[in-house]
Amino acid sequence: MEQTWRWYGPNDPVTLADVRQAGATGVVTALHHIPNGEVWSVEEILKRKAIVEDAGLVWSVVESVPIHEDIKTHTGNYEQWIANYQQTLRNLAQCGIRTVCYNFMPVLDWTRTDLEYVLPDGSKALRFDQIEFAAFELHILKRPGAEADYTEEEIAQAAERFATMSDEDKARLTRNIIAGLPGAEEGYTLDQFRKHLELYKDIDKAKLRENFAVFLKAIIPVAEEVGVRMAVHPDDPPRPILGLPRIVSTIEDMQWMVDTVNSMANGFTMCTGSYGVRADNDLVDMIKQFGPRIYFTHLRSTMREDNPKTFHEAAHLNGDVDMYEVVKAIVEEEHRRKAEGKEDLIPMRPDHGHQMLDDLKKKTNPGYSAIGRLKGLAEVRGVEMAIQRAFFSR
C-alpha cells in the first residue's frame, strides 16, 4: 500500500514536515478555499502540488472535489455545476493527479455527536451517540416526523438526556452536528439547516439514486477519457439520518453503482470505519468482490456500543474491524494487479486517530491530530509488513 496522510492545506496545524517524518510518502488534500461548484483552475492545482512536492512528498489523492447540493437535489444550476466538475477533472488530470475521492451524502458530510469522548486511557476519540442524536433531532431541531425513525425506548431516553443538558451542552451538540467537521464543505446555522433539509422533503432513496445516476453518467466518461479514477466514499454513518436517504452504505449500493455505470473509472474508497459501523457489512467480502475498483483506502476501526447505532472510534487495530484480514485482502488485491503487469499501489491513509499525549494540549482538527494518526500509520504499516513477509516474500 502507498502510505498517505490527509493534509488540510497551509492552515493545517500538522505540517508537511510532520507528514514526512511520520513515514508517509503521499499527501491527500483538496483546495478547500475554492467555493463548492467552482472550477479548480490549473494554476491553483499546480500551486498546491508545488507546495507538496517542495516538501519531498507527492499529491496522491484529491479528497474531495465536493459535489454541489444542486446536483444532489437536481435543481437550480445543477447542469452548470456538473460541467464545472467535469472541467476540474480535466484540469487535475492535466496536472498529473488522477485519483479523486468524493461523496454523495446529502446536506451533511460525516457526522458525530461528541468530538472529545474520553477513553479509559485518557486519550480522546470521536463518538456518535444515537440517544444524543435523537435528543438533537427531536428536541432541538424538532424535525417533523422524526419520531418515526426511533424506537419508543430511544425516544424516552432522548427526552431524559435532553432534560439533563445545560444550554452549553445543547449548543455544543448542535455545533458538533451542523457546523461542519474537518473535510466537510458545508456548515450551517440551525435555521439554514432546517431550510436545507426541506429541499429533500420529496427526495427518497430512489430519487437520490436517480440524481446520482445523472451525475455518474456525466462525470465517469470524462474521468475515463482523461485517466482519472473516481473513488466514492461511503456514507458516515452508513444509514439514513435526519430523514435523509443514504445511498452508498452497503455492498448492494456498491453493486448498484457498477450496474449503473460499468466503467473502471467508477470506483470506490474502502473506508473501513464508515462501512464497518454496520454489523451486516462484510468488509473483506466487499474488498474481494470490488477489489479491482478500489482506488483508495481509509483504514480505521469503530466499536459499536450497547445501542448498536451508537459507536466510538477505536484504536486502529482494535474495535469491530478485523484490520488484519482487511489489510491482507488489500495486499492480495495489489499482488493480483501486479500479476497483470500493474505496478500501482493502493493509497492508504490512517483515517482519524485518537487525540493523545502532547496533542491533548494543542488545538487540533477533530480526528486529525498528528500523534494518534502517527500511531495508526505505524500499526497498519507493521501489519502490512508482516503479511508481505509471511505470504508474498517467497
Swiss-Prot record:
EC number: 4.2.1.8
Keyword Cell cycle annotated: no
Record field: catalytic activity: D-mannonate = 2-dehydro-3-deoxy-D-gluconate + H2O
Pathway field: Carbohydrate metabolism; pentose and glucuronate interconversion
InterPro entries tied to this protein: Man_deHydtase, Xyl_isomerase-like_sf
Parts forming coiled coils: none
Entry's Gene Ontology molecular function annotations: ferrous iron binding; manganese ion binding; mannonate dehydratase activity
Example GO BP: D-glucuronate catabolic process
Cofactor(s) the protein needs: Fe(2+); Mn(2+)
SUPFAM superfamilies cross-referenced by the UniProt entry: Xylose isomerase-like (SSF51658)
Ligase among keywords: no
Pfam families membership: UxuA (PF03786)
Keywords: Iron, Lyase, Manganese
Assigned protein family: Belongs to the mannonate dehydratase family.
Matches recorded under NCBIfam families: PRK03906.1 (NF003027), uxuA (TIGR00695)
Task of the protein: Catalyzes the dehydration of D-mannonate.
UniProt-recorded name of the protein: Mannonate dehydratase
